[in-house]
A protein has these predicted regions:
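Short, polar loop motifs at secondary-structure junctions
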Residues: 1, 11-12, 57-60, 169
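Active-site-proximal specificity loops/subdomain of glycosyltransferases
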Residues: 2-44
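GT-A fold catalytic core of metal-dependent nucleotide-sugar glycosyltransferases
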Residues: 8, 33-85
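Conserved beta-strand termini and adjacent loop/short-helix elements that scaffold enzyme active sites
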Residues: 8-11, 76, 165-168
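Residue-level detector of flexible, active-site-proximal loop/helix-junction positions
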Residues: 12-15, 80-82, 113
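A glycosyltransferase accessory/donor-loop signature
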Residues: 16, 96-235
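Short glycine-/acidic-enriched loop or helix-start segments at secondary-structure transitions
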Residues: 18, 60-63, 118-119
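Short, P/G- and charge-enriched loop/turn segments at secondary-structure junctions
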Residues: 26-28, 90-97
Length: 235
């Protein structure tokens, strides 16, 4: 048995198209259903919960420590690519001179803290008034992003300034670009990636990721290696 509890909820009804990339040369659009992500506060039957995006591949147990902490809420405050370079500016701040990005890829929270409910209420409020906050904070695009919602909620709860009310998970999140690809799955906890050069798209670098957690942004790369991944899990 893989799960003790399964909660099934209807997807948010808002239209939210996202352009995805599978290498620098091919793009496609699909529905991006993330409008009810903040509702995990009411969905979870547990006091302590670690919410993970479905494309966040866990190759170690390095986040277990959060369950022994006294933090109300924690997320990644920094991200880097597969070769440990900082993410491009649009992934570091909401706009050129905007507030720092906080990532909703992994969200730890403890419902027993008063601040936790307040955080999720502010997250919902920002989502309900997304166009207003887009104008106020000057972030680009038309797609609804929960990263923007939690970043703004963090900013508001810190008195419209920098602060640590929303804790950092302590290390940068490793983030795979949609221009990157999975080259080979050696085992459950050892993957080889091709890392596309940001300036010279014809050039790739191989990167070995071993026993580290990775946000796999190129969804079709996961699909291409599905059988190998499932076989490794079964093996």
């Amino acid at each position: 048995q893989a799960f003790d509890d399964v909660v099934i909820a209807a997807a948010d009804a808002r239209a939210n198209k996202r352009t995805h990339w599978d290498s620098p040369y091919h793009s496609f659009a699909s529905d991006f259903k993330n409008g009810n992500k903040h509702k995990v506060f009411s969905y979870t039957p547990y006091d302590q919960t670690l919410l993970l995006d479905i494309d966040y591949v866990m190759m170690n147990d390095s986040l277990k420590w959060v369950f022994e902490s006294d933090m109300p809420v924690a997320m990644y405050h920094q991200a880097e690519d597969l070769i440990r370079q900082p993410m491009p500016l649009p992934q570091q701040h909401l706009s050129t001179h905007g507030i720092p990005m906080v990532w909703s890829t992994a969200v730890y929270f403890d419902k027993r803290h008063e601040l936790t409910k307040l955080f999720f209420d502010v997250w919902e409020h920002v989502g309900d008034h997304y166009d207003f906050y887009k104008f106020l904070y000057g972030f680009p695009g038309t797609m609804y992003r929960t990263d923007y919602c939690v970043s703004i909620a963090n900013h508001i709860l810190n008195g419209m300034g920098h602060g640590e009310l929303i804790n950092d998970l302590g290390v940068p999140m490793i983030n795979m670009s949609q221009h990157d690809d999975i080259a080979k799955i050696n085992s459950v906890d050892e993957w080889v990636f091709t890392v596309n050069d940001r300036k010279e798209n014809w050039e790739d670098t191989l990167a070995l990721i071993k026993r580290e957690n990775v946000h796999v942004m190129n969804k079709r790369s996961l699909d291409r290696h599905y059988d190998t991944i499932m076989g490794a899990l079964d093996g």
